[in-house]
Amino acid sequence: MKLLEIKIESSYDVEDALAYFATEDLKALGTEARRRSDFEQAGWLHDSTVVDMDDIPNLPDELEFIAYFDEETDPEEMVKCFKDKLAELAGYGLKTAPGEISVDYVADQDWNTVWKKYYHVINLSRHLAIVPEWEDYQPVFKDQEIIRLDPGLAFGTGNHQTTQLAMLGIERAMVKPLTVADVGTGSGILAIAAHKLGAKSVLATDISDESMTAAEENAALNGIYDIALQKTSLLADVDGKFDLIVANILAEILLDLIPQLDSHLNEDGQVIFSGIDYLQLPKIEQALAENSFQIDLKMRAGRWIGLAISRKHD
């Protein structure tokens, strides 16, 4: 059996959007990304190994995004869908160039594990490290919590700046045990981080079956079996209120989430947003203000923004 492989040469700006579009809208069997920055940082991350960029084959200028589909999928239709999506993203002011799309067919056993060689330990902070389940690791700091992860088909490896901003926001907020909701959990990484940092309880929601499975399996990798999982869109059908609501999702979806926050957030609760391109920040700021929320802290990594949010108080 073979798989249809769609490769897109583009920029870091659109990685999250393409991953979400491919998985949720086009029902891709899986996605992966090759980032030039991953190789440029390799010497710093992995035992000071010297990496000659000229020795790496087919290295992208910024990002090579790859999506895999069933062999029977119409390649022309997929190319058109991705071209239309790139045009839409460019309309938001995001860099999509060069935007070149290529099509190939690969053996189904090739893609499922090849991405693992680019995914290594991430020392996020003195309190958190993200460790692939196939790697050995000794904590750098005595009280550093290790998150074991096998992201599989779900979004959220910890490599991306948006995930790291969200995790730093959680770490800042968790000064005492809190009830936490992770909206759009993906691989479950943020829910697991909250649990590791001492959350009183954690609910993880997602609309994707693959995410529900990945989150449950990754929690089990970490010996965690009490994260509540609920398949739903954002906070729809979710009962109760929380001390902390976390969402690392696209800005367009955050706009849909904002009106749901009030009925699900405790009076003195906090919200952590990530996944916001700085060009889209004004829309988020306006929507928060219109719903009586204020921004307490802005965090930035590259062009990505993370926010710590609370209710406005007169």
From Swiss-Prot:
One GO MF term: protein-lysine N-methyltransferase activity
Enzyme Commission number, as recorded: 2.1.1.-
Keyword tags: Cytoplasm, Methyltransferase, S-adenosyl-L-methionine, Transferase
Residues bound to S-adenosyl-L-methionine: T163, G184, D206, N248
Main location: cytoplasm
InterPro entries per the UniProt record, alphabetical: Ribosomal_L11_MeTrfase_PrmA (IPR050078), Ribosomal_PrmA_MeTrfase (IPR004498), SAM-dependent_MTases_sf (IPR029063)
Catalytic activity: L-lysyl-[protein] + 3 S-adenosyl-L-methionine = N(6),N(6),N(6)-trimethyl-L-lysyl-[protein] + 3 S-adenosyl-L-homocysteine + 3 H(+)
Record localization: Cytoplasm
GO BP term, example: methylation
Gene Ontology cellular component annotations, sorted alphabetically: cytoplasm
Enzyme class: transferase
Cited function: Methylates ribosomal protein L11.
Similarity remark: Belongs to the methyltransferase superfamily. PrmA family.
PANTHER family per the UniProt record, alphabetical: ELECTRON TRANSFER FLAVOPROTEIN BETA SUBUNIT LYSINE METHYLTRANSFERASE (PTHR43648:SF1)
Classification via HAMAP family: Methyltr_PrmA
Protein name per Swiss-Prot or TrEMBL: Ribosomal protein L11 methyltransferase
Organism: Lactobacillus delbrueckii subsp. bulgaricus (strain ATCC BAA-365 / Lb-18)
Gene name as annotated: prmA
